[in-house]
Amino acid sequence: MSQIAILSVNHQLVPVEVREKVAFTPDKLIQALNNLHHIDGIDACIILSTCNRVEIYVASNHKNSEELLSNYLAKTHNIKRDIIDSYLNYFEGNEALTHLCNVATGLDSLVLGEPQILGQLKNAYHIAKEVKTLNKLLEKLFQHTFSTAKKVRTNTQIGASPVSIAYCAVKLSEKIFEQLSEQTVLLIGAGEMIELCAHYLNQKGVNKMIVANRTIENAKKIAHLYQAQSIGLKQFSSFVYKADIIISSTAASMPIIGKGLIESALKKRKHKPIFMLDIAIPRDIEPEVGQLDDVYLYTIDDLGQVVNDNIGNREKEKGLAQEIIVKQNQVFNKWLDTIPNEQMVQSYQFGANSIKNELLEKAIKQLKNGANSEDTIRKLADQLANKLLHLPFKNIKQTSIENLSQCEGCIPYIKN
């Protein structure tokens, strides 16, 4: 019998530079699915690949699929196992079921409760369905997951309140500028927070973003995801005047943006307002910058209370979401328990049909040879009943008294 197994590479453990090494690009995903599906013992598979996670879901006949899936991932991307081994998470059975539901509901996301992941999961499911790498078990698993996610969204407020500093930054910028899509944004840094800011700004329709970082390659990684421009940190001062929004989050030990730089930028901009958010500790922007007219400067302390309030709200909802997941998974596990019964029924049905066809052929030949119709039909009925009942009768005779009531339940015409 197949069992559910998951190999996960996600944001909780894995830096961007490793995640991108194991990502499946759209042009290679279908071939990757087919290759995985052709591995002996893999009955079905789905691959999810986003900027924050790569996950492989399989219905496998192997007792443990961790080594197999880890080797597949390394071989597919032509990388050594020791590069990724410490970043891999493996789940099977009920743990796999819980993990997938946590992913679908946003409980496992970088931003607690974010809804985008459900759409990404549905897309991965549909791709697997199109290339025929699904079976009944994975079909049922993902339909259960989507239903559970919908129930969580309907019955909790897990996605209602923004929780990340990045999200709050974007919401604050909307108060300054009515149309974010028309603004130019300068993002300074290339860490997790800047990546999230880029994500939310992109969702708001911002298509003019500049990512500046000391290591240009790290800036390019984020810029590539959102079709932004990437520059080195030494260059950013010449781009400041172009920015309507500046969000900075570096690891610099001293401020990198001073009052003089912003004064010059404002003159070039003819005092068009600049929204600035400093989410670095120590601060990246000199506090004196906030004294300038047409500058709206916020620090992480200004956002702290908003974020903490929303984290509290979502943490409460997280508990409710987990309760729903547990209850829904109990229903799914009951269905899993019936699979051996279904297989037994299918096997018995196949055997019964074989017996029926064999006896029917004999009866037809007898009728063609002139045998009496009524006698032939009666003989067919008797033989069919005897052959079909032989094995059940044998098993009933060998069944203990304690289990006899279960046998009676399978024979509705028994009279008490």
Swiss-Prot record:
Site residues, Important for activity: H99
EC number(s) on file: 1.2.1.70
One Pfam family of this chain: Shikimate_DH
Molecular function terms from GO: glutamyl-tRNA reductase activity; NADP binding
Group of enzyme by EC: oxidoreductase
Binding site for substrate: T50, C51, N52, R53, S109, E114, P115, Q116, Q120
GO biological process: protoporphyrinogen IX biosynthetic process from glutamate
Binding site for NADP(+): G189, A190, G191, E192, M193, I194
Entry text on domains: Possesses an unusual extended V-shaped dimeric structure with each monomer consisting of three distinct domains arranged along a curved 'spinal' alpha-helix. The N-terminal catalytic domain specifically recognizes the glutamate moiety of the substrate. The second domain is the NADPH-binding domain, and the third C-terminal domain is responsible for dimerization.
Subunit text: Homodimer.
Repressor is among the record's keywords: no
Family: Belongs to the glutamyl-tRNA reductase family.
Catalytic activity annotation: (S)-4-amino-5-oxopentanoate + tRNA(Glu) + NADP(+) = L-glutamyl-tRNA(Glu) + NADPH + H(+)
Protein task: Catalyzes the NADPH-dependent reduction of glutamyl-tRNA(Glu) to glutamate 1-semialdehyde (GSA).
Originating gene: hemA
Catalytic residues (UniProt): C51 (nucleophile)
InterPro entries: 4pyrrol_synth_GluRdtase, 4pyrrol_synth_GluRdtase_dimer, 4pyrrol_synth_GluRdtase_N, GluRdtase_CS, GluRdtase_dimer_dom_sf, GluRdtase_N_sf, NAD(P)-bd_dom_sf, Shikm_DH/Glu-tRNA_Rdtase
Species assigned in the record: Ruthia magnifica subsp. Calyptogena magnifica
Other known facts: During catalysis, the active site Cys acts as a nucleophile attacking the alpha-carbonyl group of tRNA-bound glutamate with the formation of a thioester intermediate between enzyme and glutamate, and the concomitant release of tRNA(Glu). The thioester intermediate is finally reduced by direct hydride transfer from NADPH, to form the product GSA.
Record pathway: Porphyrin-containing compound metabolism; protoporphyrin-IX biosynthesis; 5-aminolevulinate from L-glutamyl-tRNA(Glu): step 1/2
Residue ranges of the TM segments: none
Protein name, UniProt field: Glutamyl-tRNA reductase
